Amino acid sequence: MLKITLKKSLIGRRPNQVKTAHALGLRKIGQSVSKVENDAINGMINTIGHLVVVEKE
């Protein structure tokens, strides 16, 4: 399991980055979600890696 926390704002980001964050369930700064680690989630993290902090649970 991965704990993904949004650390930076989505304001002014490219639309694909905003949609990726929303697809992960991240909408507000400081919000965290737990996801199972797989290729799809890892690709999403690569897209918005500079906006989030990822921890292994």
From Swiss-Prot:
One GO cellular component term noted in the UniProt record for this chain: cytosolic large ribosomal subunit
Any one biological process term the GO annotation gives: translation
InterPro entries, alphabetized: Ribo_uL30_ferredoxin-like_sf, Ribosomal_uL30_bac-type, Ribosomal_uL30_ferredoxin-like
One Pfam entry name: Ribosomal_L30
Top-level taxon of the source organism: Bacteria
Coiled coil: none
Keyword terms of this UniProt record: Ribonucleoprotein, Ribosomal protein
GO molecular function: structural constituent of ribosome
Assembly: Part of the 50S ribosomal subunit.
Family in the record: Belongs to the universal ribosomal protein uL30 family.
Name of the protein this chain belongs to: Large ribosomal subunit protein uL30
